[in-house]
Amino acid sequence: MRRGAGRLERAWEWLALHKLIQRGKELELLHRAMGFATLALVTLAPLLIVVAAADPLVRGGFPSWLSDGMGLSGRSARLLNEVFSPPREVIGTTSAWSILMLAVFGVSFGGSVQNAYERIWELPAGRWHRVWRQATWMLVLMAYLYQEVQTGTTVEGFSRSFLTTVTTLFFFWWGPWFLLGGQVRWRELLPGAIASVVGLAGLRAFSTLVFTPLIVTNALSYGAVGTVLVVSSWLIGVGFVVYGGALFGRWFTEHHWVPSHDDDDGDGRAGRGEGG
């Protein structure tokens, strides 16, 4: 019994899961995920609505983007469309000043994500002139979401799954590297990108099974507010996966990623790249 208990204790120490849990508490992971959802709904969603309304291919606009991400179909997708569909003249009634303000708010969302990555990797806060990184990241994010929706209507089956996996992996591999100015090496960011892809796939499956009927139920009970609450809950899940995946990636890199001699900085922690 003592030998078995000793082995379990050594296995627990080797896994170092307690350190991952501690990191999550220090980062206030759930609190950050809720902040991610709030900013996404308040700053990112209006910008995406305007961008989707300008879609020359006219494939459903912003609601189709949201339905695709949540894995909704049928009645739940129609209810979501009723709540989030903008008026047809949204582009004509949106002034240049309004679009500029939406862009500024969208960049603030990118800044929030950048700050979270800096906290996860324990790096100093980026200087104000790095706002161009946040803006560029936002543009790439919108391009990523756009291609996800467009390929969803033209590519099916294994090809769609493969394309989604590759583009999502690239985005979550490139995104932290770019926002952090190259201060963390590519190889150290790979585990976090993989964890984010797996987490989003699991969230999509959960959303299809749970949120699909929940949207219908909430719409009947609470109307449009019920639908927005479900979307907010899903966005909290997305934030948890995005930040949790990056946090898992750093933990895995430090405790289970075998570094090369060049990467070891002498204190047992993964090496860092040059700042940029």
Where are these regions (language model features)?
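Membrane-embedded alpha-helices and immediately adjacent juxtamembrane helical segments
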Residues: 1-276
